[in-house]
From Swiss-Prot:
Signal peptide: none annotated. It is a multi-pass membrane protein. Glycans are attached at N5. CDD domains: 7tmA_OR5M-like. Belongs to the G-protein coupled receptor 1 family. Disulfide bonds join C97-C189. GO terms for cellular component: plasma membrane. InterPro entries: GPCR_Rhodpsn (IPR000276), GPCR_Rhodpsn_7TM (IPR017452), Olfact_rcpt (IPR000725). One of its GO terms (biological process) is G protein-coupled receptor signaling pathway. Keywords: Cell membrane, Disulfide bond, G-protein coupled receptor, Glycoprotein, Membrane, Olfaction, Receptor, Sensory transduction, Transducer, Transmembrane, Transmembrane helix. PROSITE patterns: G_PROTEIN_RECEP_F1_1 (PS00237), G_PROTEIN_RECEP_F1_2 (PS50262). This is Olfactory receptor 5M10. It comes from Homo sapiens. It is found in: Cell membrane.
Length: 315
């Protein structure tokens, strides 16, 4: 028999970013535009990589998967958020909340390790160019994307099961625009110590281990670049890393201050602002950053416009 303090939960209420009807209409237009740009930019990037023979390299193989994750990442949150902007009942079903929470955690972790894989690729390309084709073989590249997918989704499932194993009672209003872990935990009326510790350990390990791989890779990369005698050679070597470094800085900078701390009312309010950046702006900016700072991508876009890019399909 259920305790009278416990509730059979069928849906949650998402408080979103604002309750001002006028501002909601404006935000609907803004986030719809961001979402459409995100879809167009990332789909275009995937299409370029799949159809242009000049982009059939490990670096663009990883970038294609990064674009795919960004599409999934944005699509996991945006449609429901847009619907709630125009709806009086800003609800999400229990199953929908579970799925959104699982996918969000899984895709975030996957993206962390994709960025680490891309750093390893740049390390091999710059520090061991003669062995690049053998060390970054097709099988190795597939492994470097398969492992992050598996690790991300296993962690996402375990973390989400821990969250939804909690008992929810009283208010079911989630102080966020999607089903995020910290505000969900604050609704629980059962012991949350195990969940909080698990969230802290997984987030801390994921952030620190993936960032360690990236920093160590760039330590060797910068050492190799500074040994290049010509300024032109140094500039060319660094330019191959500039886009990746920009994305890493944006992504890690926003997420570091969100998950490696216990949830509280203040941290949840701050995390809503931070989440807008990495949930909407980061997936939109990633293909733009790679397009504007990469001559190969610019050339591929020009060839696509002229109808000359459909050469062969990548695996």
């Amino acid at each position: 028999m259920l305790s009278p303090n416990h509730t059979i939960v069928t849906e949650f209420i998402l408080l979103g970013l604002t309750d001002d009807p006028v501002l909601e209409k404006i935000l609907f237009g803004v986030f719809l535009a961001i979402y459409l740009i995100t879809l167009a930019g990332n789909l275009c990037m995937i299409l370029l990589i799949r159809t242009n023979s000049q982009l059939q390299t490990p670096m663009y193989f990883f970038l294609g998967h990064l674009s795919f994750v960004d599409i999934c990442y944005s699509s996991n949150v945006t449609p429901n958020m847009l619907h709630n902007f125009l709806s009086e009942q800003k609800t999400i079903s229990y199953a929908g909340c579970f799925t959104q929470c699982l996918l969000f955690i899984a895709l975030v972790i996957t993206e962390f390790y994709f960025l680490a894989s891309m750093a390893l690729d740049r390390y091999v390309a710059i520090c061991s160019p003669l062995h690049y084709s053998s060390r970054m073989s097709k099988n190795i590249c597939i492994s470097l994307v398969t492992v992050p997918y598996m690790y991300g989704f296993l962690n996402g499932l375990s973390q989400t099961l821990l969250t939804f194993h909690l008992s929810f009672c009283g208010s079911l209003e989630i102080n966020h625009f999607y089903c995020a872990d910290p505000p969900l935990i604050m609704l629980a009326c059962s012991d949350t110590r195990v969940k909080k510790m698990a969230m802290f350990v997984v987030a801390g390990f994921t952030l620190s281990s993936s960032l360690f791989i990236i920093l160590l890779s760039y330590l060797f990369i910068f050492a190799a670049i500074f040994r290049i005698r010509s300024a032109e050679g140094r500039h060319k070597a660094f330019s191959t890393c500039a886009s990746h470094l920009t994305i890493v800085t944006l992504f890690y900078g926003t997420l570091f201050c969100m998950y490696v701390r216990p949830p509280s009312e203040k941290s949840v309010e701050e995390s809503k602002i931070i989440a807008v950046f990495y949930t909407f702006l980061s997936p939109m900016l990633n293909p733009l950053i790679y397009s504007l700072r990469n001559r190969d991508v610019i050339l591929a876009i020009q060839q696509m416009i002229r109808g000359k890019s459909f050469c062969k399909i990548a695996v």
